[in-house]
Amino acid sequence: KVTEVYVGIAGHHIRSKQHRGNIIIHEEEHIITKEDLERLKNEQYAILMEHGEQIIDVIPQHYIVDNDSPTLNPVGRIGKCLAGDFHLITGNRTNIQNIYKSVQLAGYEVKKLVLEPIASAESVVNDEEKLAGVCLVDIGGGTTDVAIFHEGIIRHTSVIPLAGNVITDDIKSCCSIIRTQAEALKQNFGACLETPTSANEIISIP
């Protein structure tokens, strides 16, 4: 029986920022471990945010040991100061709590909130593309979600409050038609590719 679920999150309230954190290791000749990386990551959830904001996810970018060159994997190196650059994804605390409450009312528990463009990338972007560098743009109804990968790591995310519904509303206003007709025009005659179109082309309103 399924009791826990991953839940996608998006919306105008989503923000992202870069942040550097560090931990000091007092043990002499300490060898960096995976536990150290996990401790450093978990400490980022405790940083002060703006009022009403909550951290949704903390994504490591790279690590620095004792002010040395950045590395993706410092495990096994000796050092006393472990720093890391992180991509923080934040959202409105009330909106997040409402999601948790809705899932609980449905009889489940939220295992993890996942930003929707990151979830989409898991379905359509392969590891080679993430290594080479790729930008995923997911145009939905209410928002356009963006995720940029490079060297296999997510480097930037954003949620833009302009999407398909805005296009439908623009067609509705410009053509003075009802919304269902505008949506049908968009779906039947709209194109995302830059192709030559005839200025004299006549279309019929569904």
Which residue stretches match the model-derived regions?
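Glycine-rich phosphate-binding loop of actin/hexokinase-like ATP-binding domains
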Residues: A132-C174
